[in-house]
Regions:
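Secretory/exported precursors with cleavable N-terminal leaders
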Residues: 1-167
C-alpha cells in the first residue's frame, strides 16, 4: 500500500470530521477513487452521526469547511466479505456460463499506507497572517469508512470500525 494515496484533506462538519484520502488516478480510464473516513467528535457519537447522515437529503448541503490537519492517527484495519452471487445474478436475468459464482472482497489499511499521509501532515507553506486552527484527526473511537469512485458516485466499500484499538 505504500504510495497508494497522493493527496488528502480534512473537512469539518458540525459534530464530525471527514478525512478524504485520494488514490492515484486509473491509468487507462482516468477514474478517481478515494477513501473517506467519517469520525464523530464524540467517542460514542457514531450512531448519532449515521442517523444525521441518513436523514439529510442528498441535495441539501451540510455546512462544512476545509481545515488544516494537526495530529493524524488512523488505526490499521482489515475487513473481508464473501458470498455466493449465483442467485442474485440469475434474478437479474443473466445467463451464467458457470454453475456457481462467488464474490469476495477485502480492504486493508495499515500503518504503511497511513504513514505517508501522516508524514506530510506537518508540511506547511509560508504565508502572512495568523496561523489557521489545526484540527486533530485521531480515530481512536468508532468511525465509518468508505471507498468511492468520484465520477459515478459509486461506493465500492462501506464499513464501520467499532473497536479501533491503536497499535
Amino acid at each position: 500500500m505504500p504510495g497508494d494515496f497522493f493527496s488528502y484533506h480534512l473537512d469539518v462538519y458540525p459534530g464530525f470530521k471527514v478525512l478524504s484520502l485520494s488514490y492515484r488516478k486509473g491509468r487507462c480510464d482516468g477514474r478517481t477513487f478515494s477513501m473517506q473516513i467519517y469520525l464523530p467528535d464524540e467517542k460514542d457519537g457514531l450512531p448519532a452521526m449515521l442517523e444525521m447522515l441518513a436523514s439529510t437529503p442528498e441535495d441539501e448541503d451540510t455546512p462544512s469547511y476545509r481545515a488544516d490537519i494537526g495530529e493524524l492517527k488512523i488505526p490499521r484495519f482489515k475487513f473481508g466479505y464473501h458470498f455466493e452471487a449465483t442467485e442474485a445474478l440469475k434474478s437479474l436475468g443473466l445467463s451464467l456460463p458457470l454453475e456457481r459464482i462467488f464474490h469476495k472482497s477485502c480492504i486493508q489499511v495499515d500503518e504503511v499506507g497511513t504513514e505517508a499521509a501522516a508524514a506530510a501532515a506537518d508540511v506547511s507553506v509560508g504565508a502572512c497572517g495568523p496561523a489557521e486552527k489545526k484540527y486533530d484527526f485521531v480515530a481512536d473511537h468508532p468511525f465509518l469508512f468508505l471507498v468511492k469512485e468520484w465520477r459515478s458516485g459509486v461506493v465500492l466499500f462501506l464499513g464501520q470500525v467499532l473497536d479501533p484499538s491503536m497499535h
